[in-house]
């Protein structure tokens, strides 16, 4: 992707919304870091003016019954100063790290998304995004709540990750998902109508859960899902579309399960493990609707279902 790759309004469509990074956490973290560093400086100053008196061992008892022994009052002051300074520096480092994570804003247009980092603007059309990846991280990682969105044109380029520090992140990800389906579905339906198959990349459920533990979310290994008017194929198992009967989405298990006419699962995986899974489900709806209407006269069944 080239720097300052920004297209004209006729290419991008109308600007729908601008999403910026929240600053409250950064401000709070900076203030807290300054407070702890200030306290460290104050305690150090006290150590230079407070008379030490008997410079023997000092024993401190905490409210939880913990006992701390120090060789002298000087050591107490040094320990307290060092601890406060360490906390302050850790807070400062954490704030700097989060600032780096939050240095990108986004503009969502009718036809694409603009990533803004300082003075650089990079545009990606929704129609070019093959992989839209949704996943959970942080404190909500075990709940499956979507707190991250990543996108790429294809597997040859890295993912661009958007985290929930973005203001109104949930509105952002819902808008991007909707516009992505609108942009991609007509071309996908056209390919199916021409007798071609379309490919969706899938991350196994085992891998999804593993990444929730390890945190290496963007290093993924995918397996293709092939879908055409005639067949559905995953992990070498090809079945006729005419044999597919139900598509179940379970909010509790996060799974999408596709079963054949005998009730046997053809695909069972975590929904968000399917990259561009909204487009996948919409495409599958079109294919199954066409199959149901196969005996009905229609000038253009695919076009009707896309509309």
What do these predicted ranges mean?
Residues 48-55, 89-112, 116-118:
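Transmembrane-cytosolic junction motif
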Residues 36, 77-94:
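Canonical hydrophobic alpha-helical transmembrane segment
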Residues 6-8, 105-108, 222-227, 246-249, ...:
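Short, exposed beta-strand/loop patches in secreted or surface proteins that constitute
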Residues 1-74, 121, 127-194, 198-202:
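N-terminal membrane-targeting/pre-transmembrane regions
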Residues 113-114, 122-139, 232-253:
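Phosphoinositide-dependent membrane-docking surfaces
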Residues 97, 109-114, 145-146, 150-238, ...:
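N-terminal recruitment modules of adaptor/scaffold proteins
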Residues 102, 120, 221, 228, ...:
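Residue-level marker for the onset of beta-strands and adjacent loop->beta junctions
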